């Protein structure tokens, strides 16, 4: 049998709200035990965060991201923890293939939870946003396809944090995260070795040309560090308005200081309020908080 099986019991929802940060684990069956799910309706926007291969919801970078979202936006965060199906007990890349095949199933699971939120708790699809890292970005895409099959509206937004490249780069839309999976799909590219290179969203941000993130040191850790840096960048962009500004790739010689709201786009939860779409180059500093805007807000 598979070393990293998928079943509904191997995926847990870690529900984090401003009032309750216990990071308790829930399944579809036990959701109703959470205070938030004892109510008739959930009135706050919901964010699903999904991790990648060999990871889990309790990794420090995800906890930082959850905290930033709770503090900056009045949202309710649901983290899909599929560590078993993501093979976090094994490191062999042999298991990557299994984790890849599990992404569609975990996506379907998130779609099922979404339907429950909409039908039982009066949540509007316009208030649901998905954020996924690596394989979790494709999980979010599959969830986006599934909710449409369930005859629900599209999700308002999917944010793909360095979506996994291996096994996905050459796939067509139906087999990976795609811009039709939500009303707005925002992608942050940070690693060519582990991340997808092609543009697959409404906006694709190529931080430091989408590879070798500054401050990530030497190979082989450089690639792993660059790949996970996408999570850190998003966290900083939630904490600090316009922390990272993207310049249209066709005008990459342009300076951040000459950026206007019409042309450039700020990475983060407000990206979709900017008119421009396409591929953007994002220069970046080499130390936290990595912001490139020098205090400028567009």
Curated annotation (Swiss-Prot):
Glycans are attached at residues 88, 122. Keywords: Allergen, Cytolysis, Disulfide bond, Glycoprotein, Hemolysis, Hydrolase, Lipid degradation, Lipid metabolism, Secreted. Coiled coil: none annotated. Disulfide bonds join 4-87, 173-178, 216-225, 242-266, 243-291, 259-264. InterPro entries: AB_hydrolase_fold, Allerg_PlipaseA1, Lipase, TAG_lipase. It catalyses: a 1,2-diacyl-sn-glycero-3-phosphocholine + H2O = a 2-acyl-sn-glycero-3-phosphocholine + a fatty acid + H(+). The keyword Disulfide bond applies. The active site is at residues 134, 162, 227. One of its GO terms (biological process) is lipid catabolic process. It is found in: Secreted. GO terms for cellular component: extracellular space. Its main location: secreted. Expressed by the venom gland. Its EC number is 3.1.1.32. PANTHER family: LIPASE (PTHR11610), LIPASE DOMAIN-CONTAINING PROTEIN-RELATED (PTHR11610:SF173). Catalyzes the hydrolysis of phosphatidylcholine with phospholipase A1 activity. May act as an allergen and induce hemolytic activity. This is Phospholipase A1. It comes from Vespula squamosa.
């Amino acid at each position: 049998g598979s070393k990293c099986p998928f079943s509904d019991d191997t995926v847990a929802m870690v529900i984090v709200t401003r009032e309750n940060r216990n990071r308790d684990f829930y399944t579809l069956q036990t959701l109703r035990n959470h205070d938030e799910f004892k109510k008739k309706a959930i009135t706050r926007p919901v964010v699903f965060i999904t991790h990648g291969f060999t990871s889990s919801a309790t990794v420090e970078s995800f906890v930082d991201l959850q905290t930033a979202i709770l503090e900056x936006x009045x949202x309710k965060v649901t983290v899909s923890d599929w560590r078993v199906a993501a093979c976090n007990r094994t490191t062999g890349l042999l298991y990557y293939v299994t984790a890849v095949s599990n992404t569609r199933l975990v996506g379907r699971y998130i779609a099922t939870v979404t339907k429950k939120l909409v039908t039982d708790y009066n949540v509007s699809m316009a208030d649901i946003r998905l954020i996924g890292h690596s394989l979790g970005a494709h999980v979010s895409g599959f969830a986006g396809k599934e909710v449409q099959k369930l005859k629900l509206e599209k999700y308002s937004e999917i944010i793909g944090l360095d979506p996994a490249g291996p096994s996905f780069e050459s796939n067509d839309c139906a087999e990976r995260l795609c811009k039709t999976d939500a009303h707005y799909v925002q992608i942050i590219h940070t690693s060519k070795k582990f991340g997808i290179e092609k543009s697959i969203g409404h906006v694709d941000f190529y931080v430091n040309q989408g590879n070798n993130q500054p401050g990530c040191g030497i190979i082989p850790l450089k690639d792993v560090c660059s790949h996970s840096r996408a999570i850190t960048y998003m966290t900083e962009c939630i904490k600090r308005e316009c922390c990272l500004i993207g310049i249209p790739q066709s005008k990459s010689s342009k300076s951040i200081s000459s950026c206007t709201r019409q042309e450039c786009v700020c990475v983060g939860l407000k990206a979709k309020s900017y008119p421009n779409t396409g591929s953007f180059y994002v220069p970046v500093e080499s130390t936290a908080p990595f912001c490139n805007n020098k205090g400028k807000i567009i």
